[in-house]
UniProtKB/Swiss-Prot annotation:
Gene: CCD7
Gene inactivation effect: Increased shoot branching.
Start and end residues of each stretch annotated as Disordered: 11-34
Annotated family: Belongs to the carotenoid oxygenase family.
Major subcellular site: plastid
Protein name per UniProt: Carotenoid cleavage dioxygenase 7, chloroplastic
Length: 618
């Protein structure tokens, strides 16, 4: 069934004012289609290169996902090739998680989401104005099994949820949950953790980046847990889905070695309360039309002080979420079982994730507003099991921020800022253009024909109003600041998490490269949410960026302004096979002197695109 394009994603009639530090070249005339053919490599399907620009676009895209097998033994000094580290730059470390290895020595290529975790650390000494770079693989159980340290060779044995092994065991391979610790990184109470969507985090020694071992976040300090309210639990009794869950648990945990709970790689920090917020869901939730979520809150010493459990009668796939002062917020990315895909997955002919497909049966998107504390904080005793419905069909990818304000008349207003895409575009198997048969990535999956780009990830603002009795008076979605270019990785000054923010930053595509108009991203965007202004900083030709990260100059207690700081972002200069750490003055984005410094990583340590990062002050 062909679904309509969500009307809120259509380009605004009047574009917001945009300030660039340079004027991009005009867009090429509309093309009938964007077709990036895969060259004849002898590894899979073939195609015809129409011109050099198409060929270079294909090569550039592959270059972002080239394995880096080298690790640093000692921190490597990196020097600026442009500008210098500013005198007021705080001392600390920018950690970046992501995959490092995609291809083994036996013919298999894995999906980027299944690539072994490769932690990168840029330490900046603000006093000496010097920087060092360190990079090491997270020594997970999967890495120990698949890597031979004597011969320094790799053989993939774990399938992973998103991959098919071309040179390994396919049929009957139950090694699905391949914890590669490659998604995000957390530092809390002196502990550095690498996270993955589906298993326990791995603890890392923050100086050397040596792996300490697995770390059970949920049970840490459990003896001090004080669950202040049990009204969130469904005590209605055992039903058919509970019975199904009981039957699935020994299969998933015994045969497929899945942990009982799937730890989400996205966490939140409540700066006002100085709490770490995490969420897990049950392993069997992937196969049942019911979802169980456990939210945990930890104090500054990593002691578990509160848990809240919610059972929701919907089949959902959650990657990111949001919180406000008194609520947790979940976008219901709805999925369903795919019988045909399940058979293909069990036979090893498609990734295990093909057992699921998106469920676009509803034209609206449910949003669950879950109480963080006791009922006195709920809106008129509102039943949290009833979601708020937003009229557009959104698949939420990443949450930037959410906050709530209480009006004099008793209304509660909630705003959510996030990146979201259409159900018509999102595809578990084809993310990043993964093709296990050709051992190449197809850029056209991420770069749609003109007109279809509205289906790609964009930044949106969801605004809702609940009255004093908990009824939803309104729920609207619109492009953030009217911005309609493909964008993702929304971030803010973390001191403003969970409360009203004025600024947001993200990675985006300028659309100036005709062969790769939508992805990879080549811009950092700054949104002024009060004035509705948009300012951008763009890379040079054949250079791309990942997730930006805000680095504050001072703490909130010292009178910090929200944008008083810097943006650090990795620039992937594929044309010269180099990576750079770029430091931008957050206040000057959109001006010609936004770049404060560009630090060069040695060529032999050039690394593939990372996922999510963290700034940790010394």
């Amino acid at each position: 069934m062909s679904l309509p394009i969500p009307p809120k994603f259509l380009p605004p009639l009047k574009s917001p004012p945009i300030h660039h530090h340079q004027t991009p070249p005009p867009l090429a005339p509309p093309r009938a289609a964007i077709s990036i053919s895969i060259p004849d490599t002898g590894l899979g399907r073939t195609g015809t290169i129409l011109d050099e620009s198409t060929s270079s676009a294909f090569r550039d895209y592959q270059s972002l996902f080239v394995s880096q097998r080298s690790e640093t033994i000692e921190p490597v000094v990196i020097k600026p090739i442009e500008g210098s580290i500013p005198v007021n730059f705080p001392s600390g470390t920018y950690y970046l998680a992501g995959p490092g290895l995609f291809t083994d020595d036996h013919g298999s290529t894995v999906h980027p989401l299944d690539g072994h975790g490769y932690l990168r650390a840029f330490h900046i000494d603000g006093n000496k104005r010097k920087a060092t770079f360190t990079a090491k693989y997270v020594k997970t159980e999967a890495k120990k099994e698949e890597h031979d340290p004597v011969t320094d060779t790799w053989r993939f044995t774990h399938r992973g949820p998103f991959s098919v092994l071309k040179g390994g065991k396919r049929f009957g391979n139950t090694k699905v949950m391949k914890n590669v610790a490659n998604t995000s990184v957390l530092k809390w109470a002196g502990r550095l953790l690498c996270l993955w969507e589906g298993g326990e985090p791995y603890e890392i020694e923050s100086g050397s980046l040596d792996t300490v071992g697995r770390f059970n976040v949920e049970n840490n300090g459990c003896e001090s847990c004080d669950d202040d309210d049990s009204s969130d639990r469904d005590l209605s009794g055992h039903d058919i889905w509970d019975t199904a869950a009981d039957l699935l648990k020994p299969i998933l945990q015994g045969v497929f070695k899945m942990p009982p709970k799937r730890f989400l790689s996205h966490y939140k920090v409540d700066g006002r309360r100085k709490r770490l917020l995490t969420v897990t869901c049950n392993a069997e939730d992937m196969l049942l039309p019911r979802s169980n979520f456990t939210f945990c809150e930890y104090d500054s010493e990593f002691k578990l002080i509160q848990t809240k459990e919610f059972k929701i009668d919907d089949h959902m796939m959650i990657h990111d979420w949001a919180f406000t002062d008194t609520h947790y917020i979940l976008f219901a990315n709805r999925v369903k079982l795919n019988p045909i895909g399940s058979i293909a997955a069990m036979c090893g002919m498609s990734p295990m994730v093909s057992a699921l497909s998106l469920n676009p049966s509803n034209e609206s998107s449910p949003i669950y507003i879950l109480p963080r504390f006791s009922d006195k904080y709920s809106r008129g005793g509102r039943d949290w099991r009833v979601p708020v419905e937003v009229s557009s069909q959104l698949w939420l990818i990443h949450s930037g921020n959410a906050y709530e304000t209480r009006e004099d008349n008793g209304d509660l207003k909630i705003q959510i800022q996030a990146s979201a895409c259409s159900y018509r575009w999102f595809d578990f198997q084809k993310m990043f253009g993964y093709d296990w048969q050709s051992n190449k990535l197809d850029p056209s999956v991420m770069n749609l024909n003109r007109g279809d780009d509205k289906l790609l990830p964009h930044l949106v603002k969801v605004s809702m109003t609940l009255d004093s009795t908990g009824n939803c008076n309104s729920c609207d979605v619109e492009p953030l600041n009217g911005w309609n270019k493909p964008s993702d990785f929304p971030v803010i000054n973390s001191s403003w998490s969970g409360k009203k923010n004025k600024y947001m930053y993200s990675a985006a595509s300028s659309g100036t490269r005709s062969e790769l108009p939508h992805f990879p991203f080549d811009m950092v965007v700054k949104f002024d949410l009060d004035s509705n202004l948009v300012r951008t900083w763009s890379t040079g030709a054949r250079r791309f960026v990942g997730e930006p990260m805000f680095v504050p100059k001072n703490s909130v207690e010292e009178g910090e302004e929200e944008d008083d700081g810097y943006i650090v972002v990795v620039e992937y200069a594929v044309s010269v096979e180099r990576c750079y750490l770029v430091i931008l003055d957050a206040k000057k984005i959109g001006e010609s002197d936004a770049v404060v410094s560009r630090l060069e990583v040695p060529r032999n340590l050039t690394f593939p695109m990372g996922f999510h990062g963290l700034w940790a002050s010394d």
